[in-house]
Curated annotation (Swiss-Prot):
Modified residues (D-tryptophan): 65
Protein task: Moderately activates human somatostatin receptors (SSTR) with a preferential activation of SSTR1 and SSTR4. In vivo, does not cause behavioral changes in mice within a few minutes of intracranial injection, but causes a progressive loss of movement thereafter. Four to five hours after injection, mice recover, even with the highest dose tested. Shows antinociception and antihyperalgesia activities in two mouse models of acute pain, most probably by acting outside the central nervous system.
Other facts noted in the record for this chain: This peptide is an evolutionarily optimized stable analog of somatostatin. In addition, it adopts nearly identical conformations as in the somatostatin drug analog Octreotide. As this drug, it contains a D-Trp at the same position, whose synthesis is a common strategy used for enhancing the metabolic stability of compounds in drug design. Consomatins evolved by gene duplication of a 'Somatostatin and related peptides (SSRP)' gene expressed in the snail neuroendocrine system.
Propiece residue ranges: 23-57, 74-80
GO CC field: extracellular region
Keywords from the UniProt entry: Cleavage on pair of basic residues, D-amino acid, Disulfide bond, G-protein coupled receptor impairing toxin, Hydroxylation, Secreted, Signal, Toxin
Main location: secreted
Leader peptide range in chain numbering: 1-22
Protein name: Consomatin Mrc1
Modified residues (4-hydroxyproline): 69-72
Superkingdom field: Eukaryota
Single GO molecular function: toxin activity
Length: 80
């Protein structure tokens, strides 16, 4: 518990110390984030990693209490 308290205190000092030297809060917060991290970059990386819904539906089988549903029913001729 004491460690968490001191971590919190040090974080507050780390953020507020530049403010006491005349810095602006927005500049201090921006200084905590790397320059190459932008909302657009984060969104693009999330979209590129997400598989399409059809791939997820065809590959993921959800099991409850170790009871899995049978694979999707297919017609004998191999269509649909």
């Amino acid at each position: 518990m004491q460690t968490a308290y001191w971590v919190m205190v040090m974080m507050m000092v780390w953020i507020t110390a530049p403010l006491s030297e005349g810095g602006k809060l927005n500049d201090v917060i921006r200084g905590l984030v790397p320059d190459d991290v932008t909302p657009q970059l984060i969104l693009r990386s999330l979209i590129s990693r997400r598989p399409s819904d059809s791939v997820v539906r065809s590959t993921v089988h959800i099991c409850y209490w170790k009871v899995c549903p049978p694979p999707p029913w297919r017609r004998p001729n191999g269509k649909g």
